[in-house]
Amino acid sequence: MISGIVAGYQVIDVHVELLDGSSHDVDSNEQAFKMAAIFAMKDAFKNAGCHLLEPIMSVECTTPEQFQGDIMGDLNRRRGRIGEIDGRNNICIIKSEVPLAEMFGYSTDIRTLSSGRASYSMEPSHFEQVPPAIVAKLVEQRGGYGI
């Protein structure tokens, strides 16, 4: 489906099996069957309790110890979860998981927070359900689609 039930985002990786149907010589055509399928799927998704998922990134920041607090605070502000913190020779390595949507502009922000002395890397980790408050905001921004 191109326009899903939650904020209009596309529905992916769903298998649908048609169990029964009927046709009529006058009213049955390809477009009518497509519309019936769309309405049936939207109704099924509403009853199933669909969720919006977002990609979560594994983020590793390397920073001088003096900037550790500022960088951890910034990761928390971005809905990040701090995992391991490792320190050696006045350098901290902060491992965290952060939603991809919150990482835009991070390269500029981490340089600003650390006077250009920190670096980071990130890679895809997994998907998680978007928090309800953010779903509500997305629904509002995208024109009122919602469950």
Which functions belong to the PLM regions below?
Residues 1-147:
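Accessory interaction regions appended to the cores of large information-processing enzymes
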